[in-house]
Swiss-Prot record:
Record flagged with keyword Repressor: no
Feature type site, description Important for substrate specificity: G117
Name assigned to this protein: ATP-dependent 6-phosphofructokinase
Top-tier EC class: transferase
Gene Ontology cellular component annotations, sorted alphabetically: 6-phosphofructokinase complex
Summary of subunit composition and partner proteins: Homodimer or homotetramer.
UniProt cofactor(s): Mg(2+)
Residues bound to substrate: T138, I139, D140, R175, M182, G183, R184, E235, R272, H278, L279, Q280, R281
Length: 356
């Protein structure tokens, strides 16, 4: 009598990022090599609550996915899975319903691809007995427990390319160009892109800034014969003594335009503001992100084969390892104000708006 085919599930949750499809592809191809069946769950964790919200994924379904942005499974960062208010097990509890759905589908593992919010939900499901394995995703690179998340490198490439393009127009018109990039709570994109693109000022959430110091940097460049400036600001950056800025409830944004308006008043120079926004999320993943996503997907299946649950695959140095999901939850991977990268930037004359 033939044994029942092993089955695993995979879902994508939270904001989209380049490399999601590459992870899905690696999961399907690796599982297929073991003779396993893969169930793709639509619309993140919400798909565990619906009917007919999943489908079998075959090698044919993932053909050509490696360079494709977005996610064929769709995703959502809203829904029923908020923080659990009670340890009581109720049939109305979405977490309880999700665990039941996992059991009914006969999944030996559920691979959850996402950032801190996704892994927090996965951890709660694991506490209720679900065999979950996390895969770290966020363009902000702010997920704890791993040295690098996929999606970051592609976003960095987009931001750096934007700085390169802004340099030519800024120099041609003697303008100050302000580029607002993503980074709700951390400044990894702004810092890396600012260094790679040769910015003059970098403003990040970890280093509150004085707009007067930023203006002084712009005017100092003028006096030195450089009549244009490039300023890169993370969306979560904030002035010293101030708070983050929002363009709508729960949506960070507006800091770039605020910086631009203040600099026009303080320097009398012409300022233009560019907000990259979702351009950083879309499009084909970079070669590095394709490789990292592929390694993560394959490692997640290997973890399932070894019966390792309640863990997240992660990059440590050059190796892919597994770490407890709890390591990815509760705190963020932030830029250290005295890190080598920040010190490097300062040594090059890049200002952070906190100078004395």
């Amino acid at each position: 009598m033939a044994s029942k085919k092993q089955r695993i599930g995979v879902l994508t949750s939270g904001g989209d990022a380049p490399g999601l499809n590459a992870v899905i592809r690696a999961v399907v191809k690796s599982a297929s090599g073991l003779g396993w069946e893969v169930i793709g769950i639509h619309d993140g964790f919400e798909g565990l609550l619906g009917t007919k919200s999943y489908r079998v994924l075959t090698n044919a379904d993932v053909q050509g996915l490696l360079p494709r942005g977005g996610t064929i499974l769709r995703t959502t960062n809203k829904g029923h899975f908020g923080p659990r208010r009670s340890d009581e097990l109720s049939e109305a509890d979405p977490y309880v319903r999700a665990v039941k759905a996992i059991e009914e589908m006969g999944l030996r593992a559920l691979i959850t691809i996402g950032g801190e919010g996704t892994q927090r939900i996965a951890l709660e499901l694991h506490k209720l007995g679900a065999p979950v394995i996390g895969v770290p995703k966020t363009i902000d690179n702010d997920l704890a427990g791993t040295d690098r998340t996929f999606g970051f490198d592609t976003a960095l490439q987009v931001a750096t390319d934007a700085i390169d393009r802004l340099h030519t127009t800024a120099a041609s018109h003697n303008r100050v160009m302000v580029l607002e990039v993503m980074g709700r709570h951390t400044g990894w994109i702004a810092l890396h892109a600012g260094l790679a693109g040769g910015a003059d000022v970098i403003l990040i959430p970890e280093i509150p800034f004085s707009i007067e110091r930023v203006a002084e940097k712009v005017m100092a460049r003028d006096q030195q014969g450089s009549s244009f400036s490039i300023i890169v600001v993370a969306e979560g950056a904030r002035p010293r003594g101030g708070s983050e800025m929002y363009i709508a409830e729960g949506r960070l944004g507006g800091i770039g335009h605020w910086v631009g308006e203040q600099l026009e008043k303080l320097t009398a120079k012409e300022v233009r503001v560019v907000v990259l926004g979702h351009l950083q999320r879309g499009g084909s993943p970079s070669p590095y992100d394709r490789l990292l996503s592929t390694r993560y997907g394959a490692a997640a299946v290997q973890a399932a084969a070894r019966g390792i649950y309640g863990e997240m695959v992660a990059l440590r140095g050059q190796d892919i390892v597994t770490v407890p999901l709890a390591e990815a939850c509760g705190h963020l991977n932030r830029v250290r104000p005295h890190s080598d990268l920040v010190l490097c930037a300062r040594s090059l004359g890049i200002a952070f708006g906190d100078e004395l």
